[in-house]
Amino acid sequence: MSKVILVTGISSGFGKKIAEFLSQKGHAVYGTIRTDCSVAPNVRVLKMDLTDVTSIKNAVNTVIREEGHIDVLINNAGMHLGGPIEEAPVELFTRQMNANFNGLVHIIQAALPHMRANGGGTIINFSSIGGLMGLPFQPFYSSSKFAIEGLSEALRMELKPFNIRVVVINPGDFHTSNTTNRINITVPGGPYEEQFKKSIAIIGKDETGGWEPEILARKICKIVDKRNPRNRYIIASFEQKLAVVLKKILPIGLFSKILESHYGIK
């Protein structure tokens, strides 16, 4: 059955492939972008900035005006900031939280009245493996994803009476534009520079050696079609799934040593 789906952040990576694959399956797909770019021909493009509440409301209202309802909201859009906590400019980590978390809250708030009126629906929130464990030199990215985890847990319970399901997606390392688009900050000659360069090189290698975004997009298409999707889908390599399990069962000090070793921290 065809559904009306709103996907945020379709200019590249996950969002672009998700919108493309969903439209190929016959769904009415609306996708948001900040700047002009090429997208699949059957996707309705909406200009939206996650840091601009008015643009968020306008995007949702456009879908409602043209389709009458929203069946599925996929919150994929965001940004990625890398660098040590001490040296992060306040405007950048504020921008990180505004884009990844506050913007997600605003679009959920805008869509929910319409989803309730429609008798239900599905909200798919993109977290990350970094939303299940703090990652060195990605502290604000991890923080924004941890916030999405907590929000989704609470939201799931609040929306149960309205037949609105909340699904969290935890991608592992994927080969997307996230690596080149990440904003990396460190003070030249500062106390973190050497370690940051070493760790961020490892992070970049993990990402460029990761899976292609088509794998995740196909999984999202299957989730959209499910009547009762699971609360969480960890879409990652065996090693990354194992890390999630190990964090739950190991003492935090021992688990931290494993991460420190992986990221070359001594």
Regions found by a protein language model. Name each.
Residues 160-207:
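C-terminal beta-strand-loop-alpha-helix "lid" module of Rossmann-like NAD(P)-dependent dehydrogenases
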Residues 108, 144-147:
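Active-site helix of classical SDR
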Residues 84-85, 89-94:
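Substrate-binding pocket helix/loop in short-chain dehydrogenase/reductase
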Residues 48-58, 90:
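The beta1-alpha1 cofactor-binding region of Rossmann-like NAD(H)/NADP(H)-dependent oxidoreductases
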Residues 108-109, 153:
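A short, exposed helix-loop element centered on a Lys and neighboring polar residues
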Residues 128:
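Residue(s) in the substrate-gating loop at a strand-loop-helix junction
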Residues 11, 19:
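N-terminal Rossmann NAD(P)H-binding glycine-rich loop of SDR-like oxidoreductase domains
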